[in-house]
Amino acid sequence: MFERIAELAIRRARLVLIVAVVATALMGALGSGAFTKLLGGGFDDPASQSTRARDLIDKKFGGETNLVLLVRAGDGRVDTPSAEQNGKALVASLKKEKTLANVVSYWDTRSAQLLSKDGREAMVLAHVKGDPTQQQKNATSLLDDYDGTYNKALTVRAGGLAAVGNDMSTQVVEDLELAELIAIPLTLILLLFVFGSVVAALLPLAIAVIAILGSFAELSLLADVTSVSNTATNLTTALGLGLGIDYGLLMISRFREQLATGASVEDAVRRTVHTAGRTVAFSASTVAAALAALLVFPQYFLRSFGFAGVGVVAIAAASALFVMPPLLVVLGHRVNKGQMPWAKTANATTRASIWARLARTVMRRPALTALPVLAVLLVAASPLLGITFGTPDERVLPKDAESRQVSATLQKNFNGNDNAALQIVIGQNVDEAPLGKYADQLSQLKGAVRVETSTGTYTHGQESAAGPGSANLSRPNGQRISVVSSLTPKSDAAQSLVGDVRALTPPPGTHPLVGGIDAELVDAKHSISGQIPLAIGLVVLTTFILLFLFTGSIVQPLRALALNAITLVATLGIMTWIFQEGHLSPLLGFTAQPMEMSMTVLMFCIVFGLSMDYEVFVTSRIKELHDQGEDTESAVTNGLGHTGRIVTAAACLLAVSFFAFGTAKLSFMQMFGLGSGLAILIDAVAIRGVLVPAAMRLLGGSAWYAPGFLRTFHSRFGLSESAPEPAAAPEPAVSRG
């Protein structure tokens, strides 16, 4: 296959480039519509009890409250004649909106729970209709119309899940724009520093642009057939920019290395495709395999990242394999055009490089050099011992976000906790007596302060008349029960209450479904934790198989998996220290809270995949030299000498694209950017620079061990580099800073 790719590039270079330009333009046009199709949310399991409860409420009762309008009277209390007149006019207008249902307010119920403690603010509750796509559009339109000042007499601010989702969607776009403004110029500067040539520096960016536009087109197509999270665009941008540049860097470096040996342009391209091209293809396979594990999770937030990640990796690799070679053919020696003032040719041999010297130093005393590094990484991982998990809420938004401010006001200025109430829905008729008995038992559970049913209100076992909104709790073929608690939403106690409610014996012949934000958290934890063993198993198994096919050894995959696990736990430990314990909260401007579970899973797959990316970069050259007859120690020294600077440069470039998202205002996107970028640097420096040579030295010849039958299997089906390259090939011409 690689021979055909090389020959196609050599014989039809300009035709391939024309096709690539046309395809890129088409992908750009298709991808431009992606943003309007993508959705917020996606953290719930569609098959979970809480999601089914919400769906049943939507179907039978007009929907749960997902929009809270906080209305403030400008001239005093909201129950003055003037304020009441304007308030009722606002509610009447809202009830005419076809996109709203179940509009309830203080002015038409006189419910004390909808009036602030000082009487200056009141709540209007409503449900925004529609599937996730339409609901998001409806919420945006409604907020445009009602958020702000009403009749010059009332101030209206929006909160609730619909408003939080709207604010998140807006923030995602703003964060992406800022990250791109930071990452692209910094990346170009680093590329100029690495290559010392304007032309060579621009080529990897071309691959990155193709990868990003292609992945946006992929997301646009996917959004037509399934729900796709809007935050997937951030992953495609970071991965597309980073991997496109990484793969381009690897191809260009090998091409320049071959030109430096005196090879013709055509032979240099052939050799580049056969060696670096194979490495790119294999590296992309390992990264894609890790990201594909996200597809086992039912939450579309995670599945979106799986689709987006696999797609952008495939497009980046395909661009490097099919677009970069014809570019190199057309440019030839002009790839070094536009030399920067600081650039000078590096003619030093591999043995003289800093990475070769580091490898030799480590391998002289492998245990002595590895143990301190390992100790530091394990200390970094120690915060994982206290990790707790949660799901995103308004606290992931910046403090000045309106929906977050509304939530804070509700908690501070209003009595009760109605917006966080557990919602119990029964999809069949229930007689009054068993319904009352069930509600009475619910009201006596620890943490419950009030239970609302269609027939009465229950407080600690005492029944009183039904509340103003009780009519909406009953349907001919269903009942709805609201359990209001005194507990902090998403706290351990609130989650325990969910378990207590579900454990309670329901009315005979009924099967209640329990929903609400606390139930959603419990279900999300259960759903994700239930799939984690499968995801980890798939990642480990596919990685082991791919690395065995590449190396012919069963020891090398185990060594790689162990070292990647160290990178992973160190990174997650540091993220726990920062985002859960809040040590950098003042600097980064986020609110410390439990680790977002979906993002933690996402980081596991990304960190694992990117660690394998650099594992392949380094191992491919070590194996190449070992296959040429060098012993393990010599192959490691010379392999790191050849790849050390390339891996370091690639890591810095990829880290920049992720660190740029550390400027995000959404805290879980900050964690995504900082965590992924940090993991890349840990892996490229501490793991590849110290622990890999130390482990290889300690393993010695056994590093390449495989049972006889597997060696036979590998000789027939394994992957390997093509014909060996000249042993004395000098380093590529790159700039030394």
Label every model-predicted segment.
Residues 46-66, 75-165, 386-585, 668, ...:
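Structured non-transmembrane domains adjacent to transmembrane bundles in polytopic membrane proteins
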Residues 42-43:
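Membrane-proximal amphipathic alpha-helices
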Residues 1-37, 100, 130-389, 507-509, ...:
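Membrane-embedded transmembrane helical bundles of large multi-pass transporters/channels
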Residues 74-76, 198-199:
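Conserved nucleotide-binding/hydrolysis micro-motifs of P-loop NTPases
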